[in-house]
């Protein structure tokens, strides 16, 4: 993965950079871990595993589509993926800088599940600014408190401000000295209708 001449929002000097952000997950339900990725361009791809668990052989990257359009969001973000019942959920940081849920239709297509809300009903924001201060979050869905509901575990960069720029973490809540801070947002709704508490 490389940005090429126009793929990095920080300019041509990053033409050879990729910032691949993979999540290993059984995307197609065949029992083998595949890779679902974000990268420097903000596009999302899947690498299906045609080998085995111990000797994986990945297909070339294939783009993910929603309504026939390439799934696109903020740059340098890792998507979260989880199986919920007989469906697969995918969470990305969308182009409006909000945590956004999609549902797998088939190997290369997803449908829109809407923005993930805070308990207040407001969408969950990610970035502390624009350009290089955007994106960069690494997302995972995991039942942290073992209540049966999937929570958000988030790896951050010092420029993230989750869930909003006024009061978010790690900036401005912790301050400029922070480097990267793992955050937890507990799901106080259900897996069918998620809503999330403020990060801690």
State each model region's role:
Residues 1-200:
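Beta-propeller-forming repeat regions
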């Amino acid at each position: 993965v490389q940005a090429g001449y126009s793929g990095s929002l920080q300019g041509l000097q990053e033409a050879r950079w990729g910032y691949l952000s993979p999540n290993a997950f059984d995307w197609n339900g065949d029992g083998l871990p595949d890779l679902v990725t974000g990268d420097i361009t903000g596009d999302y791809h899947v690498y299906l595993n045609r080998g085995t668990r111990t000797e994986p052989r990945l297909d070339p990257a294939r783009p993910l589509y929603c309504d026939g359009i390439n799934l696109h969001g903020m740059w340098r973000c890792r998507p979260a993926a989880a199986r919920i019942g007989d469906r697969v959920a995918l969470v990305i940081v969308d182009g409006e800088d909000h945590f956004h849920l999609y549902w797998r239709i088939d190997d290369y297509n997803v449908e829109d599940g809407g923005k993930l809300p805070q308990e207040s009903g407001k969408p969950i924001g990610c970035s502390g600014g624009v350009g290089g201060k955007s994106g960069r979050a690494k997302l995972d869905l995991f039942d942290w408190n073992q209540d049966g509901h999937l929570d958000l575990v988030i790896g951050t960069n010092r420029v993230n401000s989750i869930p909003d720029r006024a009061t978010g973490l790690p900036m401005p809540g912790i301050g400029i000295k922070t480097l990267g801070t793992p955050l937890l947002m507990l799901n106080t709704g259900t897996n069918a209708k998620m809503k999330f508490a403020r990060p801690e």
